[in-house]
């Protein structure tokens, strides 16, 4: 039995569908029964649990051959990341109690970075569960291509996409959620010992200008990127409702300055197969 967190989302859904296609039993971990109904209809066992509740998580993880851990993203965390600290301890305690055979945690590129930023939340959770007497894999995917869902409307309507990734010709490690979910499902089904890190990106690194050019091709209209001035970010993010935008700003700095990358660089990462054009085509079709 494979217990899957985040099953109602993009990556968790791919993990579950990949396992089901391989005739593997899946336990869908959901917050409420209504969200689990579709997975129950697919033949999954359903476990009700929340990320804050150790007891329900331990029950959901118990007797699992593999557990896929996915923590909901927090884009506006409190200073010092107390939410991540609490989640890390809850997951650690639940895993100790349940003692599954192996664990795959969906972490992030740059989890090893020393500078504090939005992704430090994953650094904290990695540290919390890294000492478990259970085989643990930290799957560290690159920037998700699906983040370009925010770019669809400006590309279609104005032909100009604001970019926080800059310079616009700087290649950025990116990966599709489909590749991420498939790799996670594969990792769950293979035994290993101890702690390991798998770094994952797409077929090649992508520049913001390439994103614009791909939109232009798919939409059959001129599309270009426009860098959002760094000095305007804090005021802009606060105007959008963020209370503590500094971690997000520092994350963007990390990508732009190169200190958020893979430990082993591009040469040491595993490569997915899904191309940027495939992802953008899907986003356009869904009207994102």
Which residues fall in each region the model found?
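Oxidoreductase cofactor-interface core, primarily capturing Rossmann-like NAD(P)-dependent enzymes
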Residues: 2-27, 31-38, 52-55, 62, ...
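Short secondary-structure boundary segments
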Residues: 71, 107, 258
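Aromatic "clamp/platform" in nucleotide-sugar-dependent glycosyltransferases that forms part
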Residues: 83-88
């Amino acid at each position: 039995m494979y217990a899957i967190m985040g099953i109602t989302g993009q990556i968790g859904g791919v993990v579950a569908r990949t396992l089901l296609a391989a005739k593997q039993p899946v336990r869908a971990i959901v917050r409420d029964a209504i969200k689990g109904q579709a997975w129950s209809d697919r033949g999954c066992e359903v476990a009700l649990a929340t990320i804050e509740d150790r007891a329900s998580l331990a029950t959901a993880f118990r007797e699992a051959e593999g557990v896929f851990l996915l923590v909901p993203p927090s884009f506006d965390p409190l200073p010092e990341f107390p939410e991540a600290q609490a989640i890390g301890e809850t997951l650690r305690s639940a895993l100790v109690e349940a003692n599954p055979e192996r664990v795959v945690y969906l972490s992030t590129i740059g989890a090893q970075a020393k500078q504090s930023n939005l992704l430090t939340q994953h650094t904290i959770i990695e540290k919390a569960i890294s000492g478990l007497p259970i085989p643990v894999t930290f799957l560290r995917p690159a920037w998700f291509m699906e983040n370009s869902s925010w770019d669809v409307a400006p590309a279609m309507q104005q032909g100009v996409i604001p970019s926080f990734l800059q310079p616009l010709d700087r290649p950025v490690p990116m990966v599709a959620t489909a590749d991420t979910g498939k790799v996670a499902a594969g990792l769950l089904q293979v035994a290993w010992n101890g702690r390991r890190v798998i770094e994952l990106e797409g077929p090649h690194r992508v520049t913001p200008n390439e994103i614009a050019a791909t939109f232009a091709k798919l939409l059959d209209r001129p599309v270009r990127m426009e860098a959002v001035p760094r000095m305007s970010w804090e005021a802009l993010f606060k105007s959008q409702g963020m209370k503590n935008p500094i971690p997000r700003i520092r994350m963007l700095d990390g990508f732009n300055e190169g200190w958020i990358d893979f430990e082993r660089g591009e040469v040491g990462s595993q490569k997915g197969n899904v191309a940027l054009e495939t992802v953008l085509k899907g986003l356009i079709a869904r009207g994102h």
